[in-house]
Design a protein with these regions (language model features):
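...captures the hydrophobic TM-helix bundle architecture rather than a specific catalytic motif
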Residues: 1-246
Length: 246
């Protein structure tokens, strides 16, 4: 970020870190459970495993042909494939997390890995698009971090299920913001379009089994608390408009 003078990325990263350190120092909350396994989490796990697994298998042959036709790019196939597997691992951890702290941990891994994959070729366009994806997702990550802080301070819990049951407007709204950025809803959809500069397997994984699905998963988890509320209406309108416009 410093080399490329992407100062918003630095500010968002520092802000997230400061919020989490402040929360851990002043409102230490021991999570009741670290995992949640139910029908929805298992469904998302199966989708990520099946679709993501097929993409990873396809990527092995694809990258060989890719660098045969694009000799101008340094061959970093090993790095590329390892990032795909890390992406899937983070997705599994995210959908099986029972509390916001662990979910946030895996949430931000997907943000960093997507940044590395989008910037794979290291061209000027790839670097620009990778940083755009990073700052937009870090903005959502900051909302996620503040939601953890508010939940710990006012609700004395970081269990996602308990936060949803309380219907607390502020943490729910902040988590919804995180979900909208991750799933590339307007006005954050441009980062997903920019991801197309990366080799095809990475953009396929972003669309079908990881980033976008992570945002959708979180919004589904929040839906009981947003039903019949202004926030729920806003999320529905944003999703509907994005569907029509994009």
């Amino acid at each position: 970020s410093v080399v490329h003078r992407k100062y918003p990325v630095i500010l968002l990263s520092v802000a997230q870190t400061a919020v989490l350190i402040w929360t851990e120092t002043n409102f230490p909350v021991e999570p009741a459970s670290h995992m949640k396994v139910d029908g929805l989490s298992m469904l998302m796990t199966v989708i990520a495993a099946f679709v993501g697994g097929l993409i990873c298998i396809y990527a092995v042959g694809y990258m060989k042909a890719y660098h045969h036709h694009h000799k101008e790019y340094k061959d970093r196939t090993g790095f590329f494939l390892s990032m795909l597997f890390l992406f899937l691992g983070a997705m599994f951890g995210l959908v099986l997390s029972g509390n916001l702290v662990w979910m946030y941990f895996f949430w931000e891994i997907t943000s960093v890995v997507s940044f590395l994959l989008i910037g794979y070729t290291r061209t000027e366009e790839a670097v620009h698009n990778s940083f755009r994806a990073l700052w937009m997702n870090l903005l959502g990550g900051l909302g996620f971090a503040v939601a953890i802080a508010v939940s710990a301070a006012s609700l004395h819990t970081v269990q996602l299920e308990e936060v949803v049951q309380t219907g607390a407007a502020i943490p729910i709204a902040l988590l919804a913001l995180a979900g909208l950025t991750k799933s590339a809803q307007l006005p954050f959809s441009s980062w997903l379009l920019g991801a197309m500069v990366a080799p095809t397997p990475s953009s396929a994984l972003l669309h079908s089994a990881t980033m976008v699905k992570a945002g959708v998963y979180l919004l589904i988890r929040l839906s009981p608390a947003m039903a019949g509320t202004m926030g729920g209406t806003m999320v529905s309108l944003i999703g509907g408009f994005t569907f029509i416009a994009c």
